[in-house]
Amino acid sequence: MKIVALGVNSKTGKCCIIKSNATYDMLKENYDLYKVEYDSINWCGRDDVERTLELENIKLTDNSFNHKETVRGTDYDHGHDYPWTFKFDIVYEVEDKNNY
């Protein structure tokens, strides 16, 4: 799974772009995440899908957070909930989120 998150450093006020599979110690600073975009294979294993999660200032105070989403398959009339654990790495910070 490929994940990119947008957020803001709650200490410095700078916006940041975060990517997955990181070893950065997130306990050193707190980040408020407000958007996550990721690519994954859907639950029936056929299609690569892109999903965007709109977050409301999730406090990232450790190395991950859990999100449960409902995935709907075209061949089924019901959804399935899957818990994801996202792990992030700070790539860089910018002054203005409009620079994304």
Residue ranges and their predicted role:
Residues 1-13:
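Short aromatic-glycine-(Arg/Gly/Cys) micro-motifs in beta-strand/loop hairpins
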Residues 12-22:
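A short, exposed loop/beta-hairpin motif centered on an aromatic-Gly-Thr core
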Residues 30-32, 36:
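Mature extracytoplasmic domains of secretory-pathway proteins
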Residues 36-100:
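Short, mixed-charge low-complexity intrinsically disordered segments
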